[in-house]
Swiss-Prot record:
The lineage of its organism: Eukaryota, Metazoa, Chordata, Craniata, Vertebrata. Pfam families: eIF3m_C_helix, PCI. The modification N6-acetyllysine is found at residue 254. This is Eukaryotic translation initiation factor 3 subunit M. It comes from the Eukaryota. It is found in: Cytoplasm. The modification Phosphoserine is found at residues 2, 152, 367. The gene is EIF3M. Residues 180-339 form the PCI domain. The keyword NAD does not apply. GO terms for biological process: formation of cytoplasmic translation initiation complex. GO terms for cellular component: eukaryotic 43S preinitiation complex; eukaryotic 48S preinitiation complex; eukaryotic translation initiation factor 3 complex, eIF3m.
Length: 374
């Protein structure tokens, strides 16, 4: 990628121009280049570039892009420390101020580097931090498939991989990207092994709470398969998750009565939990019964007769259940409901359905062939 330069001259003259510019803005830096070479010049320029970032004039972006362009022509072994220093400056400088400029500079640096250079990890983490600080996560690449590829390209250690995914998760949460955040957290927890799963207790705990709190999340069985979550078996948080995976509303009510302080400590709201568990209980009922009486719904969902219709309307809006109300016979007629868990039985049902479709299509095909022969 081509990165704009401050001025089209030799690297040494460019460094001298940068020194002179920074000096004119009040930086404590010599106007003479160092005898140690370009990487020493850049180290001193980066150290003094705070005065440049404080400027509001139109030259700032050109000046900083000149620093970036000089960084990119250095030998890889001389780049890392300087890039880390510049990234630290851009992340910490008056957090929240001039976010567009800081994002642009980091983006230029990131995309200008060789795709397999490990220090891109540092730049990407800095991009995430700046984007999160100003609610601009949508302006940087965060697609999970791409992030997986970068993790592989950069040959990250397990610790750095976990740091990156955790940082990305927190940024997505802060920027209200709950669906993307959940996928990243599942990726993070899925990267642990039997040997280090115990180290992920905090992440697993946070993942469960975040999922239960998410108003648009209703399916949780995939979390139970994650090794760090399995490590929590026997703890209250795991018991609570299990209730949301497959139990009914009555089980949650009993759990809450016995563990009210625990629920409150998680930051979960009881009424929101009740609303979600009513829907989950209804989903389970709808899978097993194509017709459900109002009386049964009132009993199982712990709602009044006047609340049944409003509840059904809200349930249909989630698209987890498709049904209609029969007021005359005081019942709900179900056309489809999403399974709360997807195990062997559900796979068999899916296989049977697809196989039936295949057989029906073959019959149609044979009928059409017989017609064409006549």
């Amino acid at each position: 990628m081509s990165v704009p330069a401050f001025i089209d001259i030799s690297e040494e003259d460019q460094a001298a121009e940068l020194r002179a510019y920074l000096k004119s803005k009040g930086a404590e830096i010599s106007e003479e280049n160092s005898e140690g070479g370009l990487h020493i010049d850049l180290a001193q320029i980066i150290e003094a570039c705070d005065v440049c970032l404080k400027e509001d004039d139109k030259d700032v972006e050109s000046v900083m892009n000149s620093v970036v362009s000089l960084l990119l022509i250095l030998e890889p072994d001389k780049q890392e420390a300087l890039i880390e220093s510049l990234c630290e400056k851009l992340v910490k400088f008056r957090e929240g101020e001039r976010p567009s400029l800081r994002l642009q500079l980091l983006s230029n640096l990131f995309h200008g580097m060789d795709k397999n250079t490990p220090v891109r990890y540092t730049v990407y983490c800095s991009l995430i931090k700046v984007a999160a600080s100003c609610g601009a996560i949508q302006y940087i690449p965060t697609e999970l498939d791409q992030v997986r590829k970068w993790i592989s390209d950069w040959n990250l250690t397990t610790e750095k991989k976990h740091t990156l995914l955790r940082l990305l998760y927190e940024a997505l949460v802060d920027c209200k990207k709950s669906d993307a955040a959940s996928k990243v957290m599942v990726e993070l927890l899925g990267s642990y092994t039997e040997d280090n799963a115990s180290q992920a207790r905090v992440d697993a705990h946070r993942c469960i709470v975040r999922a239960l709190k998410d108003p648009n999340a209703f399916l949780f069985d995939h979390l139970l398969t994650l090794k760090p979550v399995k490590f929590l078996e026997g703890e209250l948080i795991h018991d609570l998750l299990t209730i949301f995976v497959s139990a009914k509303l009555a089980s949650y009510v009993k759990f809450y009565q016995n563990n009210k302080d625990f629920i409150d400590s998680l930051g979960l709201l009881h009424e929101q939990n009740m609303a979600k568990m009513r829907l989950l209980t209804f989903m389970g009922m709808a899978v097993e019964n194509k017709e459900i009486s109002f009386d049964t719904m009132q009993q199982e969902l712990q709602i009044g007769a006047d609340d049944v219709e409003a509840f059904v309307i809200d349930a249909v809006r989630t698209k987890m259940v498709y049904c209609k109300i029969d007021q005359t016979q005081r019942k709900v007629v179900v056309s489809h409901s999403t399974h709360r868990t997807f195990g062997k039985q559900q796979w068999q049902q899916l296989y049977d359905t697809l196989n039936a479709w295949k057989q029906n299509l073959n019959k149609v095909k044979n009928s059409l062939l017989s017609l064409s022969d006549t």
